[in-house]
Design a protein with these regions (language model features):
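Short, flexible, solvent-exposed loop/turn segments with mixed acidic/basic and small polar residues
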Residues: 1, 147-153, 378-380, 434-435
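Domain-scale recognition of functional cores that engage charged ligands
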Residues: 3-340, 349-361, 365-366, 455
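Conserved catalytic alpha/beta cores of large enzymes that bind or transform nucleotide phosphates
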Residues: 94-100, 118, 247, 262-301, ...
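Short amphipathic beta-strand starts and helix->beta connectors
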Residues: 143-147, 371-375, 429
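A general secondary-structure signal for short beta-strands and their flanking turns/coil
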Residues: 156, 330, 343, 384-386, ...
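C-terminal, active-site-flanking charged/polar segments
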Residues: 241, 351-386, 395, 411-416
Length: 467
């Protein structure tokens, strides 16, 4: 596992200021900055406990989760909408329904089509946070964030959401309603685009005997997971791309850390990229000394954490080819949060097929948990991946990298799902920040836990960070 001494940077105050200044300077050029937000996921998992309550034998909130939901119901940003929905679907407001013990009618009004339909909508369109002027969805919080750290020289903010076909129109409608007011509020111009996961990235499902899974005789193809989005990322016209999950947002009053550390990791990225570009120009010129080659090798090993024990056996001419190949790749800087027992992937130093050791984000499904030593290493990791990335996707000559070439095809994995109650094995493509970016130059930077506030269940919205 990578740690502060090994592969994770923890910049001091002086370095921090230098990186923040580097980002501010970069933003004032003509470079294209895009904020990329995967937003196609349905929110159904957020409401798993409430769906269970609807089908339970009992009618009163019984589990801790159910009780917490009803105790805090007035604190949800969707409370007013839900009140109206209850009057429409059940003829009474929330206090009235709760008083007569009809708790299920309240939950039904939240989740079902006749009510707010939250059980079928994507997370990006649900009301998360209350403000004096009305409640905000994650989509709106990402627009606000974009204005705070991703605005270009002319005040233009590019935000790209990946959405599912069925929800695209709802996203567009919300943007049409809100973008102008947000632009005025933050003094920026929004340029908002959408794309969908490409159907040709779907994968075939298998049954438990590894035979093709059939649904009424037809082969079943399923979306291949977030790794499919490397294609969407590849289609963007951008120099720098920020990537962050749709549900990891906080209200404006708590955004300061998020904004500072986003700028910080972007500053680390553009500083490293500048250096790599200078070295590539030097290698191209052919006018370099043996000392300079050694300096570039040190940069690759010490600052980009990419090592190969074989380099000491290479002649200068071979070393130059090796250095050019390694430096001329897409680059990403990923924020890493101290481990507090959250599930999810973590930062590791990993061997690649060409014998180099580099930084990778590995998921538990990529690690053999039956091997006690490997399991312990995974669980003892000091940091985990909150999905907080900044990516540089052009080469030193200004051409776009073809990101598909940098995917490690061998890192796909199998997950277990079901269809109509039947178990199946699903083939997931290499994860977007895992195998899909395996052959990138990767650097990790420690960021505070305050930048990581995901909403995995509806009751997470009752946490102080979301109030």
């Amino acid at each position: 596992a990578a740690s502060i001494e090994k592969g994770i940077l923890a910049p001091d105050a002086e370095e921090k200021n230098a990186y923040l200044a580097a980002w501010d300077a970069y933003k004032n050029t003509d470079k294209i900055i895009v904020k990329f937000v995967p937003a196609s996921g349905a929110a159904s998992r957020m409401f798993k406990n409430l769906f269970e309550f609807l089908s339970a034998e009992y009618d009163k909130p019984t589990t801790k989760f159910e009780q917490a939901f009803f105790d805090g119901i007035r604190d949800f940003a969707f409370f007013d909408d839900l009140n109206v929905a209850c009057q429409r679907t059940a003829g009474k407001d929330i206090p009235g329904l709760m008083e007569e013990g009809n708790y299920k009618a309240v939950v039904a009004a939240l989740l079902e089509t006749a009510g707010l339909n939250y059980g079928a909508l994507p997370k990006g369109l649900l009301k998360f946070h209350k403000y004096p002027e009305g409640s905000r969805t994650p989509l709106e919080e990402h627009l606000a964030e974009g204005a705070m750290y991703a605005a270009g020289k002319s005040g233009k903010v590019n935000v790209h959401f990946t959405v599912s076909t069925e929800h695209r129109e709802l996203f567009k409608k919300l943007v049409e309603e809100k973008a102008e007011a947000f632009g005025k509020r933050y003094g920026v111009d929004y340029y908002i685009t959408f794309s969908e996961q490409k159907p040709n990235t779907d994968t075939i499902a298998a049954d438990m005997d590894n035979q093709p899974f059939r649904d009424n005789g037809k082969l079943l193809f399923r979306p291949g997971g977030h790794g499919a989005l490397i294609e969407n990322l590849n289609d963007l016209d951008a120099d720098i791309i920020f990537i962050k999950n749709i549900d990891n947002v906080v209200p404006d009053k708590l955004k300061a850390d998020t904004v500072t550390y986003k700028k910080l990791i972007a500053g680390v990225l553009v500083s490293l990229q500048k250096k790599a570009f200078e070295y590539l120009e030097l290698l191209d010129s052919g006018k370099y000394t043996h000392e300079q080659i050694m300096e570039i090798l040190q940069f690759l090993q010490k600052q980009l954490f990419c090592k190969n024990p074989e380099t000491k056996n290479l002649e200068d001419a071979e070393l130059v080819i090796y250095l050019k190949n390694k430096l001329n790749r897409p680059m990403r800087v990923c924020g890493m949060v101290k481990n507090v027992g959250e599930p999810g992937g973590g930062p590791f130093l990993a061997y690649n097929s060409d014998g180099t050791i580099s930084l990778q984000i590995l998921e538990s499904s990529q690690i053999d948990m039956n091997d006690p030593a490997k399991k312990e290493m995974f669980e003892k990791g000091t940091h985990f991946n909150p999905v907080d990335l900044v990516c540089a996707v052009r080469d030193y000559k200004g051409h776009k990298f073809d990101l598909v070439k940098y995917v490690d095809k061998a890192t796909g994995f199998i997950s277990y799902k079901s269809k109509n109650g039947k178990d199946l094995k699903a083939l997931e493509l290499p994860g977007l920040w895992n195998g899909a970016m395996s052959d990138w130059n990767t650097v990790f930077v420690e960021v505070p836990l305050t930048t990581f506030n995901p909403v995995k269940t509806v009751n997470d919205l009752l946490r102080e960070q979301h109030q």
